[in-house]
Amino acid sequence: VKSYNPSAGFDQIHAAYEYAAAHHAGQNRKDGSPFVTHPLAVAQIVAEELHLDTESIVAALLHDTIEDTDATHEEISKLFSPTVADLVEGVSKLTRVHYTSKEEEQMENLRKMLMAMAKDIRVILIKISDRLHNMRTMEYQTPEKQKQKSFETMEIYAPIAHRLGMQRMKWELEDLSLKYLDPVGYREIIEALDEKAAEYDGFMSSVHDQITSRLREAGIDATVQARMKHPYSIYRKMYTQNKSLDDVFDLFAFRVIVGTVADCYNVLGIIHDLYKPILGRFKDYIGTPKPNMYQSLHTTVVGESG
């Protein structure tokens, strides 16, 4: 927390942890660990991955107290603040929402309802963090619970994370959901990706260095990041387009981050000069942003070795 917010209310955060530990005393998670390890992990996600404020971290530590203990909105309001109490109560209300339909129209209505119920956007952010930690520790639940929660996550929480521009969380939520919705398919893709990663490690490093060098020559200040596509995006492409993994050519992605819109287009020109672009695969999300206001340029190119 100190790294991004040196003036955070550390005394209040510590007090919230002590309050949560006292109220969850005697409660355990499915793996046998003290229950308080869960709100602590959620607070860690809120702080380290989302860089939210003190009130959000405190509310994350307390997010299950109204739902699962004798803590009250009034008491939390007095001990911490009315805003923290409202955040905790907001998360509790979202927790009580039940998912009964698999119809896409009903799912979309439910997503809209959850967004509307969260009068403060931080409620949704804490709830997504809560779901992310639960998915990270889902192996201790029954197979039935695993599939139920994974379906909810895939259909409700991952799309909301996408709308809020939380791409990394969206990807992880999707991958963790796939792990339980189709264990065999997930495992096959993970094993194949591990093989591809070992096979193409040198290739990715070479491309990274080529791009970095050309941008430096052009005087463009940029950060170049390389990654393999995440398992669910590959799974979806394989099953919706009836392809094998060997038929999915865009397994790797490079992200180039620059400071200006002009440099985005300059970088695109350099990339297309270095590698052959595939027709019909260019998307301009700067000129036409996505509904969540995501802006970037996307292109698919063919490397020197194909």
PLM features per residue range, with description:
Residues 1-253, 257-306:
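Active-site helical microenvironments for divalent-metal-assisted chemistry
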